[in-house]
Amino acid sequence: MMNPTNSRDVPLYIYHAGQCDPKKCTGRKMARFELARLYDKISRLPRSAILLDPMAEKALSPADDPKKGIIVLDCSWEEVERVFPELEKLNLEHRALPYMLAGNPVNFGRPFKLNSAEAFAAALYILGYKEQAEKVMSKFNWGHSFLELNREPLDEYATAKNSSEIVEIQSHYI
């Protein structure tokens, strides 16, 4: 059970398909530290939350309301295609993260190749939950790299009023 240290923390949820190396899985590590809840069934995910979806038409922005939580899918693209019909039933707010570089050792410096922890941290930072983003990244010895690599764009994204402004800011980094 997730037990946020701060009652104002945004609830974080992970659909975990069990397809990754357990020793490298950022989602499992977040769950061990009670920073996120893992689900192995789509039907159990909370309704009306924000789903971080790289194919979403709308970018995540500070205008989005994270009270119902943020969901990350920790699975292969094939699995995403398989579960997408179920996701549609949950009334989720699909949002894409803007341009950022991975800070993890597997994809270091590669644009848009974020792992689950980095995706959560980026979303939290953009939504104004910088301390919670830093808490998530503090559990990984490379976590500071992600925040340092992306500090400037994250600070700018956090000042945007809406999705359109996020896209405009993003264009300066691509």
UniProtKB/Swiss-Prot annotation:
Known EC number: 2.5.1.157
Keywords, sorted A to Z: Cytoplasm, Ribosome biogenesis, rRNA processing, S-adenosyl-L-methionine, Transferase
Top-level enzyme category: transferase
Cellular location(s): Cytoplasm
Keyword rRNA processing in record: yes
Organism domain of life: Archaea
Gene Ontology molecular function terms on file: 18S rRNA aminocarboxypropyltransferase activity; S-adenosyl-L-methionine binding
GO CC terms, sorted: cytoplasm
Task of the protein: Aminocarboxypropyltransferase that catalyzes the aminocarboxypropyl transfer on pseudouridine corresponding to position 914 in M.jannaschii 16S rRNA. It constitutes the last step in biosynthesis of the hypermodified N1-methyl-N3-(3-amino-3-carboxypropyl) pseudouridine (m1acp3-Psi).
HAMAP family from the UniProt entry: TSR3
PANTHER family per the UniProt record, alphabetical: 18S RRNA AMINOCARBOXYPROPYLTRANSFERASE (PTHR20426:SF0), RIBOSOME BIOGENESIS PROTEIN TSR3 HOMOLOG (PTHR20426)
Sequence similarity: Belongs to the TDD superfamily. TSR3 family.
Name this protein carries in UniProt: 16S rRNA aminocarboxypropyltransferase
